[in-house]
Amino acid sequence: MSDVIIYGGAFNPPTIGHLKIIEYLVNKFPNNKIIILPTNNFYKSKDIVSFDHRKKMLEEMCKDFIDKIEISNYEQTLDKYYGTYYTLQYFNHPLFVIGADSLETIHKWIKYPNVVTENRFIVFPRGNININEVINNNEVLLNNKSKFIICDDFIENDISSTEYRVNKEESYISKDVLKYIKDNNLYN
């Protein structure tokens, strides 16, 4: 069986940016099991909507290819925020999707450097961050360079959930997610 790919995030709400990454993964890694993993409600954000709402928004956004992915309840079962390292252990060290911005701060993650040395990553561009430079300037990353798949061919969009929550810009989210948000009176 091919590797499992985990794409985790708050998805508060899931945006067009998240959708493009999921579509890229489905197309680029058609033989891999792709698991979308919303964080639990103990995650750092104080204005996070419930896990159930975020999972349902993901289901709405991904309904055209829901048969090619799994949206996991795993983090909903946890009693606190444990960090990425423990999640990757639970899923038996899958490929883990991160943005270049997360790669820049990976040295601050729980169980660093083990989270790097024991796992593999799919890295997406973000902002003007030079991914190879980040790797080359960190000894742990450099010594584990073979564990990073860099998605140089991904066309980045700079849409964030935070920007949607602040600006309520409807073009940042899919029509299905927008309808769900309005129907459930979220992010007011």
Q: Could you tell me what each predicted segment is?
A:
Residues M1-N188:
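Nucleotidyltransferase catalytic core that binds NTPs
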